[in-house]
Every structure is written in C-alpha cells, then in structure tokens.
A protein has these predicted regions:
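PRPP-associated nucleotide enzymes
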Residues: 1-289
Length: 289
C-alpha cells in the first residue's frame, strides 16, 4: 500500500504515512503557461492498494482537476483499490437539483466513481445528502470527539446552533456533555445576505459556543456572535470544522475559534486554534485497509 499526496494536504498525507507505516509518494505536478496541469506519478503502482489524500479547497477547480488526474494516473499505472481521503469536499454546498443549474456534487460523485475510487473518506460533509449520491462506500467522519476535550473545559456554557444545518451536531454534543442548547433562526435576503431573526434558549450571562461546519466569508459566525452579545452572552467561542476563509472575515466579536486542519491554512489570527484530524482518519483507515 502507498499514500499519494495532492497539493492541498501534503502535511496530513505525510503524517498518515508515518503513523500507518505506509510509503509516501509525492507526484510531479507542473503547470503550463495557460495554467493546464501535467501530473506524473514516478513510482510503480501495479497491483498496489492506494490512498490518495486531497481536499478540494481553494483554488477549488484546480485542485479538483488535479484530483481527477491523480486518480486516473494511479488507475492507469495498475493500482488495485483506490481509497480517497478527501477531508474537505468542495461543492458540497451545491447539492440541490434544479432545472436552472447544474448539480456539481452529483457530477463529482460520478467522476470519482468512474475514475476508479473504491472508497471515499471525508470529514463532516456540509450536507448528508451527498452520501446518497455515491454508489461506492463512503465514510463521512464527524469530528465531534475531537472537540469534547476542549468543550469540557468551559464552565457556565451553552451550545448554540447558528442555523438549522448545525442542529444535529449541537444536539449530539449537548447530549454527550449534558449542556444546555440554544438555536438561532437565520434567514437570507434576496442578495443572499444572512440575518439572524430569532433565538430559542437563554444565553444571557452564558459562555456561548457556536458549532458549525464551514467558516468561509465569516458572515454567519460574525452575525451570530453579534446576535448573542445583543442577547446578553458573556463570551462567544466557535468550533468549526472547515476553515475555508475565502474572504476578509471579521472575528472581532469572538474570543476563540477552533478549526480542524482539513484545509491547510497559513497566517491565521492568534484567535484560531487548530485541532488535527489525524486521529479520526487513522482510526477510519484502520477499519478499511
């Protein structure tokens, strides 16, 4: 068995290889002047089981094409099973069918299967609907157990869902730690800007902990933090799985933000704390390989 790293998760792939005692391979990737990608794997792969590690985070489309080339090259080189570790599944927010727009998540699922992926491991999909798009085994690993040691240190706290999509995660954590819950109702206007309209639960004088899967522009988290402060919150912290961070984000109202390393990030504010996903990936891979 061998581990092949894409451009987006080299450090994670290296750590997986060391922990699992599997040979690490880094493909040769070059770019033409028009930004076309050329990819070569200069290692024999005949009859080998392969683990490919690649998130499709920014630049999303480049990394997606790179991933397709990685899988296709490995398959043509004679790889047997191909396990794809895709910590962050880009385009998962576009999972709804429409007559007016494509459904990229379905297309990606189709491509991955046709190219030869035999098992997909991903972390905290934005929508659980994505799992139903695949005909191959898929492991949607939740990071909640990684959060628990940190959450247990908070006193006088309440777990808050910033929108409907976070409800299940919040309730799971609340049940595990026997902590009170609060729910924010979020609406979007015609410009797709979000507005917090209602809160269920008493946050006054409490240390609030927001739980979400993605921080991108930071609008939801910022407005949720502001809404909580308006309702008397003592402090606001956040646990967020994927640090997409594609725009200038405002985190002034938050005390601390915990994110995982599904996406390799640089130059983060001192308010950020990175939680490694290595333990849960190693556990899942050991169940498969």
């Amino acid at each position: 068995m061998k581990i092949i790293a894409g451009s987006n998760n080299k450090l994670l792939a290296t750590r997986l290889a060391i922990t699992l005692n599997i040979k690490y391979i880094e493909p040769k990737i070059t770019y033409f002047s028009d930004s076309e990608i050329k990819l070569e794997i200069q290692e024999p792969l005949h009859n080998e089981d392969i683990i490919i590690v690649q998130s499709t985070s920014k630049p999303v489309n480049d990394r997606l094409i790179e991933l397709f080339l990685l899988i296709d090259t490995a398959k043509k080189a004679g790889a047997n099973k191909i396990i794809l570790v895709m910590p962050y599944f880009g385009y998962a927010r576009q999972d709804k069918a429409s007559n007016q727009a494509a459904m990229p998540a379905q297309l990606i699922a189709n491509f991955l299967e046709k190219l030869g992926v035999t098992h997909l491991i991903t972390i905290d999909l934005h929508s659980d609907k994505i799992e139903k798009l695949f005909n191959i085994p898929i492991s949607n690993v939740k990071p909640i157990n990684l959060y628990l040691p940190f959450l247990q240190n908070y006193k006088n706290c309440i777990i808050v869902a910033p929108d409907k999509g976070s409800t299940n995660k919040v309730e799971t954590i609340g049940n595990l730690l026997n902590i009170d819950l609060a729910y924010i109702t979020k609406e979007r206007d015609i410009n797709n800007s979000c507005n917090m309209v209602e809160i269920t639960g008493n946050v006054e004088g409490k240390n609030c902990i927001l739980i979400d899967d993605i921080i991108d522009s930071g609008e939801t988290i910022y407005k949720a933090a502001n809404f909580l402060k308006q309702h008397g919150a003592l402090s606001v912290n956040a646990f967020i799985t994927h640090a997409v961070l594609s725009k200038n984000y405002d985190i002034a109202l938050l005390d601390r933000i915990f994110v995982t390393d599904t996406i390799e990030t640089d130059d983060l504010s001192s308010k950020f704390h990175i939680i490694p996903i290595l333990p849960i990936l190693v556990k899942e891979l050991k169940n498969i390989i």
